[in-house]
Amino acid sequence: KIKANVIPDEKAMQKVSEVLDDPSAPLSVKVWTDKKEYREGDKIKMYIKGNKPFYVRVVYKDAAGKLLQLLPNPYRRDNDFNGGVVYAIPSGNDKFELEVNPPFGEESIAVYTSTSQLGDLDLKEEGGVYQVKTKSKDIGIKTRSVKIKEVTEGKAQQASEFFEGKAVVKTGK
């Protein structure tokens, strides 16, 4: 057996952090939760942070496979965020909480992000969020689909950047 003490290299960790926050780097968005495991009745809080301004769609998949779009939602339609800022979900005008109830098991939070507006999904309003009617396998494709918008004169066209991230949590009694 080998025993070793691991001492984190602060300079290396700082360098990695700077790269992840660099707005000139390709779009990168981190998603995480306040805990990895939740019990019945717990409230899930999630966070997102991008390295540059971005648009986001946040989709929650419960243990039964039901998909809910948390952002944008009926009360918080704006889905554009600044880079370098940590955002909590739910917060602000959100009219929902993520309370752990059966069925229990592995659940996930997926973020679909872009530097330009996102394509549309087939949604049905359900309380303070939307139920996603689009098939799970098609969400990424439809999110990245083209949105027609007017071009303002003199403004150079930029290619859109996309990023998908995911956080997985376990729920139980």
Descriptions of predicted regions:
Residues 1-173:
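Secretory-pathway glycoprotein ectodomains that are cysteine- and/or Ser/Thr/Pro-rich
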